[in-house]
């Protein structure tokens, strides 16, 4: 009886040591693998969640369209300058358009203490096709030439409106020049001595 009890006890120890232990190891391995997958998926989720936020923060949805058509809506001079700053701060824009060379914007705007200067590429247009005017402190640039096909008409029609800060620019001193398909508009600024913020009133 004692020998049979010892054999049963030994058999139980073998079962617990030989069968359940590998199962325990197997469960531990599967758990680690599952946790590894969860961590990996979580990392992917984090990257996927972070990427759109970063892109939205650095580049608004209209950014790429603004680069090539900044005048599709009425804009202020400040908005144009901010757009230029964005382009200068992000030189990889050319690569994002599939070109290794510097991206040609087709437009440029500069401002200093003397004047505001705007350049716009208008290939295929002559100075007779371009009209520049100012209405209610808004600089209006329009161009349209006679075309033979509808495709050309769409490509060679241009219209823009730029709001000018009141009492800052000399409206009657604006100059426009069309040369080699490039329109250059210069808007001089009012000098301090020319400003008429103070009026002397004669006392009778």
UniProtKB/Swiss-Prot annotation:
The sHSP domain, residue ranges: 98-204
InterPro entries xref list: A-crystallin/Hsp20_dom (IPR002068), HSP14.7/HSP23.5/HSP23.6-like (IPR044656), HSP20-like_chaperone (IPR008978)
Name recorded for this polypeptide: Small heat shock protein, chloroplastic
Taxon lineage: Eukaryota, Viridiplantae, Streptophyta, Embryophyta, Tracheophyta
Subcellular location: Plastid, Chloroplast stroma
CDD domains listed in its UniProt record: ACD_sHsps-like
Major subcellular site: plastid
Similarity-based family: Belongs to the small heat shock protein (HSP20) family.
Keyword DNA-binding appears in the UniProt entry: no
Keyword vocabulary terms for this entry: Chloroplast, Plastid, Stress response, Transit peptide
Region (Disordered): 34-55
Compositionally biased spans, kind Basic and acidic residues: 37-49
Gene assigned in the entry: HSP23
Lineage top rank: taxon: Eukaryota
Cellular component GO terms held in the UniProt record: chloroplast stroma
Entry keyword Chloroplast: yes
């Amino acid at each position: 009886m004692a020998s049979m009890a010892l054999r049963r006890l030994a058999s139980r120890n073998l079962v617990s040591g030989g069968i359940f232990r590998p199962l325990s190891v197997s469960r531990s391995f599967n758990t680690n693998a599952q946790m590894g997958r969860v961590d990996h998926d979580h990392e992917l989720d984090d990257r996927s969640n972070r990427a759109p936020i970063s892109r939205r923060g650095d580049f608004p949805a209209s950014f790429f369209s603004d680069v090539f058509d900044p005048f599709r809506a009425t804009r202020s001079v400040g908005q144009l300058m901010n757009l230029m700053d964005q382009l200068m701060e992000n030189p990889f824009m050319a690569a994002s358009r599939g070109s290794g060379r510097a991206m040609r914007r087709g437009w440029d705007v500069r401002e200093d203490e003397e004047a505001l200067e705007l350049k716009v590429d208008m290939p295929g247009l002559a100075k007779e096709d371009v009209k520049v005017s100012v209405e209610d402190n808004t600089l209006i640039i329009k161009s349209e030439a006679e075309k033979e096909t509808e495709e050309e008409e769409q490509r060679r029609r241009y219209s823009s409106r730029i709001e000018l800060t009141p009492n800052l620019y000399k409206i009657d001193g604006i100059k426009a020049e069309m040369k080699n398909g490039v329109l250059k508009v210069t808007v001089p600024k009012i000098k301090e001595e020319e400003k008429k913020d103070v009026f002397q009133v004669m006392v009778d």
